[in-house]
Amino acid sequence: MGSKVVIYTDGACAGNPGPGGWGALLQFNDTSKEVFGYELDTTNNRMEITAALEALRMLKKSCNIEIYTDSKYLQQGITAWIHNWIKNNWCKSNNEPVKNADLWQKLYAELSKHTIIWKWVKGHANNSGNIAADKLAVQGRETAIEILKCRG
C-alpha cells in the first residue's frame, strides 16, 4: 500500500432537509488540500457521507488512510452496520431500506482501493482538522443558500 494520508471530513445543512455542504481536509506529508461542495436539497447525513466519498475520490493511488469524522452515523455505518446492510440486500434488520444506500454503495466501492482506519472525533472541540473541515462544509452550505437566493 502507498503513502499515508490523513483526512478530516464534515457535513453541514441548513434545515434537514435543506441546502447543504460538505468539506474535507486531506493531509499528506507537509502538504494539504481543501475541498468542498454543496447540494441544494439534502440532509446532514448525506453531506457527511459525501464528504468522505469525495475525499477518497481525490486520491489517485492506493493509500494508507486515517479518516476523522465527527459523525457517528458515518463512522458506525461504514465500520459496523454496512456489513449487515450488504448481507440483507441494503435493508435494515426490520426490512426497511437503508437510508442513503446510493451513497453508502459508492463509498463502499472506494474502500477496496485503500487501507482505511475510521476515527470519530468530537465536533467543535478544538481539533484543528475537524475545525477546517467544518469551515469547508459551511462554505459549501452557504454557497447552496446563495444559489437558492439568486433563484428567488
Curated annotation (Swiss-Prot):
Its cofactor is Mg(2+). One of its GO terms (molecular function) is nucleic acid binding. The keyword Plastid does not apply. Residues 1-142 form the RNase H type-1 domain. It catalyses: Endonucleolytic cleavage to 5'-phosphomonoester. Mg(2+) 2 binds at residues 10, 134. Mg(2+) 1 binds at residues 10, 48, 70. The keyword Isomerase does not apply. One of its GO terms (cellular component) is cytoplasm. One of its GO terms (biological process) is DNA replication, removal of RNA primer. It is an enzyme of class 3 (hydrolase). Keywords: Cytoplasm, Endonuclease, Hydrolase, Magnesium, Metal-binding, Nuclease. Binds 1 Mg(2+) ion per subunit. May bind a second metal ion at a regulatory site, or after substrate binding. Its EC number is 3.1.26.4. Transmembrane segments: none annotated. It is found in: Cytoplasm. Endonuclease that specifically degrades the RNA of RNA-DNA hybrids. Belongs to the RNase H family. NCBIfam families: PRK00203.1 (NF001236). Monomer. This is Ribonuclease H. It comes from Rickettsia massiliae (strain Mtu5). The gene is rnhA.
